[in-house]
Amino acid sequence: MAAVCDVCAKGPGFGKSVSHSHRRTNRRWNPNIQTVRAQVAPGNTRRMNVCTSCLKAGKVVRG
């Protein structure tokens, strides 16, 4: 599944995992992306990948 929101274009964040011995390895934090059926126009729905912060903010009308 894509790790990019179709509404706000939020993508993964990158950084390092730091172990107890301070070894650093690359990692990424993915946004919480959900596949939902969203209403694009009245009577017209399509599947979209939307982050949960957009769902919670009401930026998407589920249909």
Curated annotation (Swiss-Prot):
Descriptive protein name: Large ribosomal subunit protein bL28A
Top-level taxonomy: Bacteria, Bacillati, Actinomycetota, Actinomycetes, Mycobacteriales
UniProt xrefs under Pfam families: Ribosomal_L28
GO CC, any one term: ribosome
PANTHER family for this protein: 50S RIBOSOMAL PROTEIN L28, LARGE RIBOSOMAL SUBUNIT PROTEIN BL28A
GO molecular function: structural constituent of ribosome
Family stated for the protein in its record: Belongs to the bacterial ribosomal protein bL28 family.
Chaperone in keyword set: no
Source organism of this protein record: Nocardia farcinica (strain IFM 10152)
GO biological-process terms attached to the record: translation
Alphabetical keyword list: Ribonucleoprotein, Ribosomal protein
Encoding gene per record: rpmB1
